[in-house]
Swiss-Prot record:
Binding positions (UDP-N-acetyl-alpha-D-glucosamine): 8-11, 22, 73, 78-79, 99-101, 136, 151, 166, 224, 330, 348, 363, 374
GO terms, biological process: cell morphogenesis; cell wall organization; lipid A biosynthetic process; peptidoglycan biosynthetic process; regulation of cell shape; UDP-N-acetylglucosamine biosynthetic process
Binding note for cofactor: Binds 1 Mg(2+) ion per subunit.
Annotated positions binding acetyl-CoA: A377, N383, Y384, S402, A420, R437
Protein name as it appears in the record: Bifunctional protein GlmU
GO MF annotation: an example: UDP-N-acetylglucosamine diphosphorylase activity
Chief place of localization: cytoplasm
Record's subcellular location: Cytoplasm
Organism: Pseudomonas aeruginosa (strain LESB58)
Enzyme Commission number(s): 2.7.7.23, 2.3.1.157
Family indicated by similarity: In the N-terminal section; belongs to the N-acetylglucosamine-1-phosphate uridyltransferase family. In the C-terminal section; belongs to the transferase hexapeptide repeat family.
Subunit annotation: Homotrimer.
Length: 454
């Protein structure tokens, strides 16, 4: 059967106390709405409709994609009214209704829910709670069949004792939806059009109301304030940490790892505490990552080592290479096999060949280094003249003395050496020694300045 999905994302989220629409607040570095959309896409629907209201322009701008149809709910008059805004666009056999502030919903749960939908049967997602205060209750008859959903504010004292609650997630036969939504009333405590009222209508029309429950109740936990956002963030991170450990990663403290993207890992990887992985990160076998590191959109080849307090973005570390402690590798940085950058070294769009080393206190930008080069402490590639950037190219086996300024554009040939303290402005041929500093002078009988007596 064909499927369309409606995601409700129009709410203001006043309890977040934020100018940012609630559905754009992040979980694991991604907007909550983005998590829901990604899960919805896995179901391969005909189309995904996103109902927007508060901050509509910003939500549309941030989440724009060819497979999304944004539908405006100008007034927030309830969930039933929100779904009704999408009715003109719906024609599928099944319609699944999701929520933009319920970011941890899982594919398996939705597949089980949809499997129960037929032309004469709808399915809703429920969960049992010890404290169901504030949630709509699932009312069943003596045979256990679902009869209705009663919102907390409208529930009787007896109904408020029910522990099974409505998550809001619902899958219905598409051809029935327009009729049910057209019959909704706002005669209730909140003066809103409740989507949940379609359950009683379906029962009255002779349909069967099936139900399913998630394997993990946190899947259907919504976010209404910063505390709930933090709770879901930690739960999400715990799940990702467990997933990594099942794949052969040693986490020295699973509670002190943050994963904010798509991570591919090999075996026998070790990750120390307070590590943040963002974007697309590939970690091959036997990689070690030290504490307090941030790694974004990078590739770490087999046996690479990232030492403490290092920051990598858009970088690639070759097999057996190492970086840090306190190294910064910016986009376009590549370390060849067994290359090394040490403490307080910054690379930007720079490639170090196999076995090359920059031990400490250096900046290498827009540079290409051959194999087995040695970069002395305090070396800087002067790659920017205030208007344009230029490259520095070193051959193999180049030795750069300490405290050098390499003024680009510049080429240094194989086996060349530069003296400590040099400013190199012209090409250095292979195997040459280049000096670029003032000659030392010694003044005899020099007397140090003395303090002026007051």
């Amino acid at each position: 059967m064909s499927l369309e999905i409606v995601i409700l994302a129009a709410g203001q989220g006043t309890r977040m106390r934020s100018a940012l629409p609630k559905v754009l607040h992040p979980i694991a570095g991604k907007p909550m709405l983005g998590h829901v959309i990604d899960c919805a896409r896995q179901l391969q629907p005909e189309r995904i409709h996103v109902v927007i209201g508060h901050g509509a322009d910003l939500v549309r701008e941030r989440m724009a994609a060819d497979d999304l149809n944004f539908v405006l709910q100008a007034e927030q008059l309830g969930t039933g009214h929100a779904v009704a805004q999408a009715l003109p666009f719906l024609s599928a056999d099944q319609v699944l209704i999701l929520y933009g502030d319920v970011p941890l919903i899982q594919l398996d749960t939705l597949q089980r829910l949809l499997a129960q939908v037929t032309p004469d049967q709808l399915s809703l997602l429920t969960v049992d709670m010890l404290d169901p205060t504030g949630y709509g209750r699932i009312v069943r008859d003596d045979q256990g069949a679902v009869q209705a959903i009663v919102e907390h504010k409208d529930a009787t004292p007896a109904q408020r004792q029910i522990g099974e609650i409505n998550t809001g997630i619902l899958a219905v036969p598409g051809k029935r939806l327009a009729d049910w939504l057209g019959r909704l009333s706002n005669d209730n405590a909140q003066g809103e059009y409740y989507l949940t009222d379609v359950i009683a209508m379906a029962v009255g029309d002779g349909l069967v109301v099936a139900s399913a429950q998630p394997l993990d109740a946190m899947e259907v936990q919504g976010v209404n304030d910063r505390m709930q956002q933090a709770q879901l963030e930690r739960h999400y991170q715990r799940l990702r940490a467990e997933e990594l450990m099942r794949q052969g990663v040693t986490l020295l403290d699973p509670q002190r790892l943050d994963v904010r993207g798509e991570i591919s890992v090999g075996r026998d990887v070790l990750i120390d505490v307070n590590v943040v992985l963002e974007g697309r990160v590939v970690i091959e076998d036997d990689v070690h990552i030290g504490p307090n590191c941030v790694i974004r959109d990078s590739v770490l080849r087999r046996g690479a080592v990232i030492k403490a307090n290092s920051h990598l973005e858009g970088a690639e570390l070759g097999e057996g290479s190492d970086a840090g402690p306190f190294a910064r590798l910016r986009p376009g940085s590549v370390l060849g096999a067994r290359a090394h950058v040490g403490n307080f070294v910054e690379l930007k769009n720079a490639r170090l060949g196999e076995g090359s080393k920059a031990g400490h206190l250096s900046y290498l930008g827009d540079a290409e280094l051959g194999a087995n080069c040695n970069i002395g402490a305090g070396t800087i590639t002067c790659n920017y003249d205030g208007a344009n950037k230029f490259r520095t190219e070193l051959g193999d086996d180049v030795f750069i003395g300490s405290n050098n300024s390499l003024v680009a554009p510049l080429k240094i040939g194989d086996g060349a050496t530069t003296a400590a303290g040099s400013t190199i402005t012209h090409e250095v041929p292979a195997k040459n020694l280049a000096f670029g500093r003032a000659r030392q002078k010694n003044l005899e009988n020099w007397k140090r300045p003395e303090k002026i007596k007051k």
